[in-house]
Amino acid sequence: MKLADLSPPGQTVVTGSLLFTAEDIIAFAEKYDPQPFHTDPEAAKNFVFGGLCASGWHTCAGWMKMFVSYWAKEHARLVAEGIEPPKLGPSPGFKKLQWLKPVYAGDTITYSVTLIESRPLMSRPGTLINLTANQGVNQKGETVLRFESTVLEFD
């Protein structure tokens, strides 16, 4: 089975939702993005965001966490049904990354992926390159994150 057969271009798949707690935001930021508006709730009040908010990289990591979890379940489902899952990976990269709104402590972000196109990779026979649009939306329906990514697929 090919990815485009499983999820045709234009069809959006919700991969999961993630609650961003103050504790998680601080722990991630202390390790990877130690800026006061990510690590100190009191200091964060005096910055442009007006409160503690997640690092953009944390929101991206949340997307990856939800995608990996979703794909593991989908892969297992297909195998259980006797269907050979698409052979995906690695990703050559991403582009157009935008952090559109801050993600605050207490926000729940719902992540999704939409296949835009799947085409043969001319330099590698038997390989497709899939382009996807990805996003995260908060509980108010506001898009907080979006980017495009590519993933290889093999025969």
Features from the language model and the residues they span:
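HotDog/MaoC-like acyl-thioester-processing domains
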Residues: M1-V14, W99-D155
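Short, Lys/Arg-enriched charge-dense amphipathic segments
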Residues: D40, A61-A80, Q98-T108, S112, ...
